Design a protein with these regions (language model features):
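Structural motif
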Residues: 52-55, 95-101
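A short acidic Gly-Thr/Ser loop motif
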Residues: 99-100, 155-156, 163-169, 290-295, ...
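Glycine-rich phosphate-binding loop and adjoining helix at the ATP-binding site
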Residues: 68-80, 84-90, 101-138, 186-203, ...
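Glycine/GP-enriched mid-protein hinge/lid loop-to-helix segment characteristic of carbohydrate kinases
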Residues: 2-62, 74-75, 106, 116-118, ...
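Conserved glycine-rich phosphate/nucleotide-binding loop
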Residues: 435-468
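Phosphate/ATP-binding catalytic cores across multiple sugar-kinase/actin-like superfamilies
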Residues: 210, 387-405
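Short glycine-rich phosphate-binding loop at a beta-alpha junction
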Residues: 89-99, 216-225, 403-414
Length: 468
C-alpha cells in the first residue's frame, strides 16, 4: 500500500482508499485515530485517558480512550481533537481530564481564554452560564456519568401544541390524541429584532391560534434553532440583535410562556427534534440526524429511546485532520463539520470544481445554481456531490466513536435532488469498501412523506409527559 505524508508532523498514514475528487488531502479522523491507537498498542505504551464533561444540573458525560503518556505531537493532536469533538457533541462548562499530567498541562493552555481554543471556552461559558474550567485528575477520579435520559417524545395523549422556530418562519400544530387538527406556518424575522417582546408575542399568538382549535391545552412542546439548555435559549441567531441588558429576558421566553399557560412545557434544540421525528416515523431508536442546510445541524436519540440533552452542535466538531483544511471564520478552527456538510461546503468546493458564479450570489442561491447544473448533467457539479458523499462515508464511522447509533437520517437542502442521490451512493461505497465491519450496522434514511407530514412541530408536541 502506498503511504502519503499527510500532516505537518509527518505522521505516515495509509491514504483513504477512496479519494475525494475535489479535496485530495482530506484526512479522515477515523483513519488517523485508529492508526494512532494501533501504534501505541503495538509499542506497549498505551495508558488510559478518561474525559468527563460536566454540564447543567450536575449532568456529566464520560469518554474513555487510550494515549501515549508522553506529550509527542501525535498524542497532543489526538487528544486535543477528541476534546474539541466532545465539547461540541456533549457540551459542558467543566472538563475533568483523567490522564497524563504533561498532556493536561499542555491542553489546559489551549483550552483557556488566552489559548487557541478561546472561542470554544467562551461559547461553553455562555451556553452553561459558568466560567469554563479544565481540571486534571487520575483516570479513576473522573466522576461517574450522569445523563438526563429524557424519554424521547411519542407522548400523544391529550390536547397538545407543538411549535418549531426557524430563522425565517415558525410552525405551530395542534394535536389531539395523536391526530393533527391544525397546523400553520408563519413568516417572521427574529434576527433583527432588538425587543424581546417580539419573540414573546409571536410565539404566544401562535399558541393561542392553535389552542382555539381544541377544548383545552394539556401540554406544549417546542423545537428551536440554537443552544437550548434547561428550557432557556443560551446561544441563538434568533436573538442575535437583542441588546445585552435585555438578553436574560429574551432567553427566558419559554419559561415566561409556561407561567402564562401553567401546563407541562418542554423545548429542545431542533436537531434533537429532527432525530425524534425520524425515530417516531421509522419506529426505531439509535438515530443520529444530520441536517445539511445553511450550516450542519445534528440530533441524537439513543438506543433506549432517550434524548440525552447533549449539545450536538456538530457544525463545530472536527471531521478533517488535514492541517491545511479550510478554516471556519467564526471559530477560527480548521476542519469543522459545517465546512463539509452544509451550503458552506458547496461554496468551498466551487473553485476546485472550476465553477464560477457571480460574487453577489448568497449561499442558498449558489446551491440553486449548482442544482440547475446537475439537472443539465454538468460533470463539474457532480464532483461536488461526490466529494461531500466521500466526506460523509468517512465521517459516519468517526461519529460512531462518539454516538452509538444504528440509523442515520440525512436531510437538508444540500441532500435534495439528483445531487443528494450521489451523496448517499458515495457514502455507501466508502462504507462498503473501507469499513465493511460498520456498513451493515448503519442504515441511512432520507425523510419520507410520512416523516415530512409528521414534521418538527408535531414531534415537538409529543415531548412533555402529562401529569397524572
Amino acid at each position: 500500500m502506498s503511504h502519503h505524508k499527510f500532516t505537518e508532523q509527518d505522521i505516515v498514514l495509509p491514504p483513504p482508499t477512496i479519494r475525494a475528487p475535489l479535496d485530495r488531502y482530506f484526512l479522515p479522523p477515523v483513519l488517523y485515530n485508529r492508526c494512532y491507537r494501533d501504534r501505541i498498542i503495538a509499542k506497549g505504551i498505551a495508558v488510559p485517558l478518561v474525559i468527563g464533561l460536566e454540564r447543567e444540573n450536575g449532568l456529566l458525560s464520560r469518554f474513555e480512550t487510550i494515549v501515549d503518556s508522553s506529550e509527542d505531537p501525535e498524542t497532543l493532536r489526538y487528544v486535543e481533537r477528541i476534546i474539541k469533538f466532545l465539547l461540541w457533541s456533549r457540551g459542558g462548562w467543566k472538563l475533568h481530564f483523567g490522564g497524563p499530567k504533561v498532556i493536561a498541562d499542555h491542553l489546559r493552555k489551549n483550552y483557556s481564554l488566552r489559548g487557541s481554543r478561546k472561542f470554544d471556552c467562551q461559547m461553553m461559558a455562555t451556553a452553561y452560564g459558568r466560567k469554563f474550567e479544565f481540571v486534571h485528575c487520575t483516570p479513576n477520579r473522573v466522576p461517574s456519568a450522569k445523563e438526563s435520559h429524557l424519554e424521547a417524545g411519542g407522548n400523544l395523549k391529550g390536547c397538545r401544541i407543538g411549535f418549531d422556530l426557524g430563522a425565517s418562519d415558525y410552525k405551530v400544530s395542534a394535536v389531539v390524541d395523536g391526530r393533527v387538527i391544525f397546523t400553520e406556518e408563519t413568516p417572521w424575522d427574529p434576527k433583527v429584532q432588538k425587543n424581546p417582546e417580539y419573540h414573546y408575542h409571536h410565539i404566544s399568538a401562535a399558541l393561542h391560534r392553535a389552542a382555539a382549535c381544541m377544548p383545552r391545552v394539556d401540554a406544549i412542546g417546542g423545537s428551536s434553532a440554537g443552544i437550548i439548555v434547561d428550557n432557556e435559549i443560551r446561544v441563538a441567531s434568533l436573538l442575535r440583535s437583542i441588546p445585552h441588558k435585555s438578553f436574560s429576558l429574551a432567553a427566558a421566553v419559554f419559561k415566561r410562556i409556561q407561567k402564562d399557560w401553567k401546563v407541562p412545557m418542554l423545548v429542545m434544540n431542533d436537531g434533537d427534534i429532527t432525530a425524534l421525528a425520524a425515530s417516531l416515523s421509522i419506529r426505531q431508536n439509535g438515530v443520529l440526524g444530520i441536517a445539511m442546510g445553511s450550516s450542519e445541524a445534528a440530533g441524537f436519540i439513543d438506543k433506549n429511546g432517550n434524548i440525552l440533552g447533549w449539545l450536538n452542535e456538530l457544525a463545530f466538531a472536527p471531521v478533517d485532520y488535514n492541517p491545511k483544511a479550510t478554516v471556519d471564520e467564526w471559530s477560527g478552527d480548521a476542519g469543522a463539520g459545517a465546512m463539509y456538510f452544509s451550503q458552506q461546503a458547496v461554496n468551498k468546493l466551487l473553485p476546485a470544481a472550476k465553477i464560477k458564479l457571480p460574487v453577489k450570489l448568497g449561499l442558498p442561491e449558489r446551491l440553486i445554481e449548482l442544482q440547475n447544473l446537475m439537472i443539465k448533467g454538468d460533470e463539474r457539479a457532480a464532483k461536488i456531490y461526490e466529494t461531500i458523499g466521500i466526506y460523509l462515508g468517512y465521517t459516519i464511522p468517526h461519529y460512531a466513536e462518539f454516538y452509538d447509533y444504528a440509523h442515520m437520517l440525512i436531510l437538508g437542502r444540500v441532500t435534495t435532488g439528483l445531487g443528494g442521490n450521489i451523496v448517499l451512493a458515495e457514502a455507501k461505497k466508502v462504507l462498503l469498501q473501507e469499513f465493511p465491519e460498520i456498513a451493515p450496522k448503519v442504515t441511512m434514511h432520507v425523510p419520507d412523506e410520512k416523516m415530512r407530514r409528521l414534521g418538527q412541530a408535531v414531534a415537538a408536541a409529543s415531548l412533555p409527559t402529562l401529569k397524572n
